[in-house]
C-alpha cells in the first residue's frame, strides 16, 4: 500500500515537472520565433530616431526685390525627454536646477518652473525635443557642449527664425509666424501625439535644421505644395497673419528628415540617413517699401500731433488709429498699405508671452495687431457722394448733370411730419446754385439730399435701392477679395436689410421701416453705411481708370531662388514659379459726358478755389493735378472721422497712376487732416524724390534725415475747407 502511494506521488510530481519544462520550452520558442520581430522593432525604436527638420521659410520681397522678411539661424536649448525619463526624479530635478542656474548666469533668463512645465507638456510627442530657450548667444552653446556630461538630456541645436531688416515697416501686411496649434495641425492633416494613426515604429522628432537646405530649383511647385501643407508637427512654425498666412503654401519649406542612432543616454551614435529640407519660395509684393515707409512715417506723425487737441465742438481729438492705402488704378496693385498703430513683428519670433498678447489686444493701445486698412470700418462721409452721383445718372433722374439746385444750406424733407424734417450742410453753409460738378467740388449736402429724397418718393419709378446699387458696382458692401485674412465687408444698408435687422433684434431699432431720412443719410455716407479704407481707395481707382474694378493685389510673383547668397532681384538667380495677373471684378457703365461731369467735379475739389481740398493741395502741390473727394463723417459723442480719397495724374490726359485713401477717426474735418496728409504723401512720389526706406539698424539717423527733408519742403500745413 505504501509502495503504491509513493509511486503515485512520484508520478504526479513527474507530470508537473514535465508540464513546467514544456511551458518554459514553449515560451522560449515563442520569444525566439513568433515574437522576435516585435522585440527587434522595439529595440530599433529605442535606438533609432527619425527627426523632422523644418527648413527656412521663403523670403518676402518688395516689388523691387528688397528683402522685407528673411530667415536667420537661431540657437535653441531644448530638452530630450527620452534620457531624462530614465533618471530618478531627484537626479532629473538636479539637472533642471543646474540648467536654470547656468542659463541665468549666462544671460538667458530661465525659470525652473518653465523647464518643469515644458518637460511635462503633453503637446509634444514623447520623443520630441522640447525648446526651453530660443535665440541664445553662441557662448551658451559652447558652454553647454563642453559640459555635456553635466547636462544629460539637454541638447543645443539650430533652427531658422524670421528676421525683419526694415523693423516695423509693413508689419500688418507682412504678418507674423508662430507655433502651430492643435487645431491648425488637424486642419492640415497633421497628427497629434498619441493619436491612433501615429507611427508605432521609429519615433519621429521635430528638431531645428542642422543641415544646409536644398533650393531644388528644378522641382515643381505642385509637387512641393502637398508636402508643405500636410507634413506638420507640433512645434513647427506657421503663418499667423498677413502674407505669412495667406501664402503659407509657398513660403513654407518642404521639411527634411534625419534618421539617427542614439545610445541609452540619448547621445548621437550615427546618422543613418539624411534628406535635406527644401527652402520655401520667395514672395514678391506689390508694395514699394520706400513709399510704404514714407506713408507710415507721415501717418504716425500726424496722429501723434493730433492727439490731445480739440475740435470746434470741444470734442477731444483722440485719433486712436489711422490708415493710408495707395493703389495702381490700372491693375489693382497695392503700392502701400499703412496702418497705425504698428507693432514689432520680431517679438513674435520666439512666441508671444501672455503679457505681450494682452498688450496687443488692449483697446487702450489702439489694437496694434489690427490692420485698420482692411479690418477697420468707418462711415465714408462725403466720399460716398461719388456713388450717389453715379446713381443719379444710372437711374435716369439726371440727364446731363446741368440740372441745378438752389442750396441755401438747409433742406426740408418732402412729405415729412415731425420735428426732424430739416437737414443741413456742414455748418449750415449755403452754396447757392449748384449742379452735379459744383456740388461735388464744394461738397453740397443739399444737392444730394434732394436727389436721395426724390429717389425715395418715386420708388415706383426708380426702385428702392438706386444709391445702393451704384455703390455696389464700386464694391461697397462686399469684400474686395484682397488675398489677406480678416478683411471686413463693411455695410451697405437697404430697406430689406433694415427690416431683417429689426426682426432679429427689435431692441436695437425704433422701427424696421426705411424712410426718406435713411435714404438721405445714405446718400452722403452717413447713417448705417460703413466702408473700409481699402474699399474706398479701390472704388476711386475704379472711377479713375474709367470704370474697371480690379481685385486689389498684394503679390506680383512667386519665385524660387537658385542661391540665397546672391542678390534676390537678379533674374538669373531665380526661377519664376508663377506670375500674378490682374483680376477684373466688374465694369461700371456710364456715358462719357456723364463721366466727365463727375470727373470735373472731383477735379475741382483740389483745383478750384472753392474746392474743399484746394488749400491743402496748394500747400503741398504734386507734380500733376489730383482729383478726389474729402469726407467728414459724424460720430456720436466723438470727434469727426476725417477722410480723403483721390487719384493722380488727373485732368492732364494721362492715365491715372496712383489712387490714395486716408482715414483718421476722431480727428476732425477731411479737408483739414486727411487731405493735407494725402498730398504730403503724394508730393515726393509724384516728383520722384522719395527717400529710401531705413533699414532697422539705421532707423534713427535715417528718420532724422527724412524729417529734415520734410521740414525743408515747408509743407507742414493742415488748413483746408470744412469737408
What residues fall within each predicted segment?
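Short, gly/Ser/Thr-rich active-site loops of penicillin-recognizing serine hydrolases
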Residues: 568-577, 581-583, 677-723
Amino acid at each position: 500500500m505504501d509502495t503504491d502511494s509513493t509511486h503515485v506521488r512520484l508520478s504526479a510530481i513527474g507530470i508537473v515537472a514535465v508540464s513546467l519544462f514544456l511551458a518554459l520550452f514553449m515560451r522560449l520558442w515563442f520569444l525566439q520565433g513568433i515574437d522576435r520581430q516585435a522585440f527587434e522593432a522595439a529595440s530599433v525604436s529605442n535606438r533609432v530616431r527619425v527627426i523632422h527638420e523644418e527648413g527656412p521659410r521663403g523670403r518676402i520681397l518688395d516689388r523691387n526685390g528688397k528683402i522685407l522678411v528673411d530667415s536667420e539661424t537661431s540657437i535653441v536649448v531644448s530638452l530630450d525627454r527620452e534620457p531624462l525619463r530614465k533618471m530618478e526624479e531627484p537626479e532629473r530635478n538636479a539637472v533642471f536646477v543646474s540648467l536654470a542656474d547656468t542659463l541665468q548666469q549666462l544671460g538667458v533668463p530661465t525659470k525652473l518652473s518653465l523647464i518643469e512645465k515644458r518637460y511635462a507638456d503633453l503637446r509634444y510627442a514623447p520623443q520630441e525635443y522640447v525648446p526651453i530657450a530660443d535665440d541664445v548667444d553662441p557662448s551658451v552653446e559652447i558652454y553647454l557642449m563642453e559640459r555635456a556630461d553635466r547636462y544629460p538630456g539637454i541638447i543645443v541645436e539650430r533652427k531658422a527664425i524670421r528676421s525683419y531688416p526694415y523693423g516695423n515697416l509693413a508689419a500688418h501686411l507682412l504678418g507674423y509666424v508662430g507655433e502651430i496649434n492643435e487645431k491648425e495641425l488637424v486642419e492640415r492633416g497633421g497628427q497629434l501625439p498619441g493619436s491612433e494613426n501615429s507611427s508605432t515604429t521609429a519615433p519621429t522628432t521635430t528638431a531645428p535644421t542642422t543641415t544646409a537646405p536644398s533650393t531644388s530649383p528644378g522641382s515643381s511647385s505642385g509637387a512641393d505644395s502637398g508636402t508643405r501643407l500636410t507634413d506638420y508637427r507640433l512645434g513647427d512654425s506657421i503663418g499667423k497673419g498677413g502674407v505669412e498666412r495667406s501664402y503659407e503654401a509657398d513660403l513654407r519649406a518642404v521639411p527634411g528628415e534625419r534618421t539617427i542612432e542614439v545610445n541609452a543616454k540619448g547621445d548621437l551614435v550615427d546618422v543613418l540617413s539624411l534628406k535635406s529640407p527644401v527652402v520655401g519660395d520667395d514672395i514678391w509684393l506689390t508694395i514699394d517699401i520706400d513709399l510704404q515707409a514714407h506713408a507710415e512715417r507721415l501717418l504716425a506723425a500726424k496722429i501723434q500731433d493730433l492727439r490731445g487737441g480739440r475740435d470746434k465742438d470741444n470734442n477731444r481729438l483722440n485719433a486712436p488709429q489711422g490708415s493710408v492705402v495707395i493703389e495702381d488704378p490700372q491693375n489693382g496693385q497695392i503700392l502701400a498699405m499703412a496702418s497705425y498703430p504698428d507693432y514689432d513683428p520680431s517679438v513674435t519670433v520666439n512666441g508671444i508671452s501672455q503679457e505681450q498678447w494682452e498688450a496687443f489686444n488692449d483697446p487702450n493701445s489702439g489694437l496694434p495687431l489690427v490692420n485698420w486698412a482692411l479690418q477697420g470700418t468707418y462711415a465714408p462721409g462725403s466720399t460716398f457722394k461719388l456713388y450717389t452721383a453715379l446713381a443719379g445718372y444710372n437711374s435716369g433722374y439726371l440727364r446731363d448733370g446741368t440740372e441745378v439746385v438752389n442750396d441755401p444750406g438747409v433742406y426740408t424733407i418732402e412729405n415729412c411730419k415731425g420735428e426732424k424734417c430739416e437737414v443741413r450742410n456742414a455748418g449750415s453753409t449755403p452754396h447757392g446754385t449748384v449742379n452735379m460738378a459744383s456740388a461735388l467740388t464744394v461738397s453740397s449736402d443739399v444737392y444730394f439730399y434732394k436727389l436721395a429724397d426724390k429717389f425715395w418718393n418715386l420708388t415706383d419709378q426708380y426702385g428702392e435701392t438706386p444709391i445702393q446699387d451704384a455703390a455696389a458696382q464700386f464694391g461697397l458692401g462686399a469684400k474686395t477679395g484682397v488675398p489677406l485674412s480678416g478683411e471686413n465687408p463693411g455695410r451697405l444698408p437697404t430697406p430689406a436689410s433694415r427690416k431683417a435687422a429689426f426682426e432679429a433684434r427689435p431692441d436695437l431699432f425704433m422701427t424696421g421701416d426705411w424712410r426718406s431720412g435713411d435714404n438721405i443719410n445714405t446718400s452722403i455716407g452717413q447713417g448705417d453705411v460703413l466702408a473700409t479704407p481699402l474699399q474706398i481707395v479701390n472704388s476711386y481707382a475704379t472711377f479713375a481708370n474709367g470704370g474697371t474694378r480690379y481685385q486689389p493685389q498684394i503679390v506680383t510673383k512667386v519665385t524660387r531662388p537658385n542661391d540665397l547668397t546672391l542678390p534676390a532681384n537678379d533674374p538669373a538667380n531665380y526661377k519664376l514659379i508663377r506670375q500674378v495677373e490682374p483680376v477684373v471684378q466688374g465694369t461700371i457703365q456710364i456715358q462719357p459726358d456723364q463721366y466727365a461731369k463727375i470727373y470735373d467735379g472731383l477735379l475741382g475739389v483740389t483745383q478750384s478755389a472753392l474746392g474743399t481740398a484746394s488749400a491743402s493741395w496748394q500747400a503741398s502741390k504734386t507734380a500733376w493735378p489730383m482729383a478726389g473727394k474729402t469726407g467728414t463723417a459724424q460720430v456720436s459723442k466723438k470727434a469727426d472721422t476725417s477722410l480723403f480719397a483721390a487719384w493722380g495724374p488727373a485732368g492732364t490726359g494721362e492715365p491715372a497712376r496712383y489712387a490714395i485713401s486716408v482715414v483718421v477717426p476722431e480727428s476732425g474735418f477731411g479737408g483739414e487732416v486727411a487731405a493735407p496728409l494725402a498730398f504730403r504723401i503724394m508730393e515726393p512720389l509724384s516728383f520722384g524724390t522719395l527717400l529710401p526706406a531705413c533699414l532697422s539698424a539705421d532707423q534713427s539717423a535715417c528718420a532724422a534725415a527724412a524729417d529734415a527733408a520734410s521740414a525743408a519742403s515747408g509743407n507742414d500745413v493742415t488748413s483746408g475747407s470744412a469737408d
